[in-house]
Amino acid sequence: MAIANKNIIFVAGLGGIGLDTSREIVKSGPKNLVILDRIDNPTAIAELKAINPKVTVTFYPYDVTVPVAETTKLLKTIFAQLKTVDLLINGAGILDDHQIERTIAVNFTGTVNTTTAIMEFWDKRKGGPGGVIANICSVTGFNAIYQVPVYSASKAAALSFTNSLARLAPITGVTAYSINPGITRTPLVHKFNSWLDVEPRVGELLLEHPTQTTLECAQNFVKAIEANKNGAIWQLDLGQLIAVEWTKHWDSHI
């Protein structure tokens, strides 16, 4: 999907990977970039507008843990303004295994709820035009960082949800793919809490191994958007974009 002249909603587009990805997106010339984020960062919004003045960049405060009805209300406002939305990026995430309920609420339930809300406007069974969803998951959805099992499980759940969305595309008209970054140098990974403090130095230990920058991740994210492959499981690691072939161990046969 060419980004030029498209309308894009980016949930958590001001975070570490999110902000660099927003920068790369506006360089590609969408018509509108609507950022929904819990963090209000007027400086970042002004920077994005300055990168490409032809792009309309809009910010709305948004917490992914709110009920679906509240998200639907916000999306109604956005759709009334833009008329159409081409791409939804779900990027909210936290890494803190002390906060069990919030980790699941942000990393998994928030993605499900935001997706559910936009179906009101996109689902072809309701006369909608369809759309594209890019969910930021994690390589920990493939193999856990076992010292943060809650985080890893929440990302595995988001990945499974995304894979199902892709399979449902013939019914809903909405396609989906997952973005799975490897260890990326962001404030998120410099210091965080392991589950039951099983490894106090888990962040430091991860950074002893090869990592990637947020810019490298963002540039590959844009490539994945442009590829626009329904059901793709993209691994963004060490500056590379890799299409992961998922191994099927069981099938429901329905």
Swiss-Prot record:
Q: Which residues bind NAD(+)?
A: 10-33
SUPFAM superfamilies per the record?
NAD(P)-binding Rossmann-fold domains
Q: Does the keyword NAD apply?
A: yes
Active site residues of this protein: Y151
Q: Which GO terms describe its biological process?
A: alcohol metabolic process
What protein family does this chain belong to? Belongs to the short-chain dehydrogenases/reductases (SDR) family.
Name of protein: Alcohol dehydrogenase 2
Q: What organism is this sequence from?
A: Drosophila montana (Fruit fly)
Which classification does the entry list for the species? Eukaryota, Metazoa, Ecdysozoa, Arthropoda, Hexapoda
Q: Which gene encodes it?
A: Adh2
